[in-house]
């Protein structure tokens, strides 16, 4: 898939909001998920939480649990945008377990950032 240049300019908090917009609420019904992410380039910790068909993110800098995903912000974006598969991320030592990320990816809609606008 093409590189989403708009997303590359987003700080992590805004990018996680973007993922929340991509979440298909109907497919996410009844699903619950927690992903702890450590961004090595910005030294930020984040927890993604899926519940009630809503994906939220909050800072988790002091969380002592082992992160599921440890990578740079751009590597994380590549994973969530399909340019890096969960299996590749596991092989590269970035991702501890592919299953939770695969589940989240299955709940996200894909859309082109250059969609046409329909005007009245």
Where are these regions (language model features)?
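C-terminal interaction segments
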Residues: 1, 61-120
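Acidic, aliphatic-rich amphipathic alpha-helical segments
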Residues: 1-56, 98-120
């Amino acid at each position: 898939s093409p590189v989403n240049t708009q997303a590359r300019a987003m700080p992590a908090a805004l990018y996680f909001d973007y993922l929340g917009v991509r979440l298909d609420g109907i497919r996410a019904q009844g699903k619950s998920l927690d992903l702890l992410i450590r961004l090595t380039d910005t030294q930020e910790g984040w927890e993604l939480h899926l519940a009630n068909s809503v994906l939220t993110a909050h800072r988790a800098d002091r969380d002592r649990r082992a992160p599921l995903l440890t990578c740079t912000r751009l590597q994380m974006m590549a994973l969530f945008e399909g340019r890096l598969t969960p299996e590749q991320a596991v092989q590269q030592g970035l991702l501890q377990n592919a299953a939770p990320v695969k589940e989240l990816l299955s709940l996200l809609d894909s859309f082109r950032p250059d969609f046409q606008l329909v005007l009245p």
